[in-house]
């Protein structure tokens, strides 16, 4: 990336009917994500967490061939801090720091976002791109889409949090099969395994995603967000600790405007009108 280059069109953003749409716009590069697009995605998910005007997030990509083929390593990251003249080209620990500040942060930003995140899977998701699918809350896939755990096929080990996410979705033995062999996984097979929620014709992907996203965006946002956190924590906490967290969140949720509206609408026998707080 040349100094001063305008890269704003490589990640398209818009908010429509309470839905934040994020579109990776690098179809000519397989929608691979360079560091500056990755960092914008991290910021977008973190900001969506706090933004009362955003009540659901959709992540998709341009074109119909690739959703995301992982990190674009052809774009070098800028050097952070100072560099003495006698420093080696590659300092021990630099890869660790790059991982921690990179796709691992992106995975965490998606998982920790209070708002529900839908991936509209428009094509191939490979390597780190598959993490974006696994980290999302819901996935709608075009019928021509596929996922590839390409790491071992290139002599690499899975990164970007894939080893954390994949077995939680498909189970340990199936996760090992997918990672050890790196075979293509069709959208239909991904749906059978529970990675994908719904498969639709490619021409219907945007409309199907819009329907789900706007349905979520018109729902009780806090209740959805706290439900997301409980489900994520269920595989991490002991039974005792999870039940304690559940009780605390139920208590907090009863103080929301939407919780009060839910009770009132039930008593008054009318549809609820959710505000999102």
Residue map of PLM features:
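Short beta-strand->loop
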Residues: 238-242
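Short, charged, surface-exposed hinge/linker loops at domain edges
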Residues: 228-237
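Glycine- (often His-adjacent) and acidic-residue-rich active-site loop
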Residues: 61-106, 155
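Short, active-site-adjacent cap segments at secondary-structure transitions
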Residues: 64-68, 126-127, 231
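Crotonase-fold acyl-CoA enzyme core
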Residues: 108-224, 251-264, 270, 277
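Conserved CoA-thioester-binding segment of acyl-CoA-metabolizing enzymes
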Residues: 1-64, 78
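Terminal peptide-recognition signature
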Residues: 22, 26, 41, 59, ...
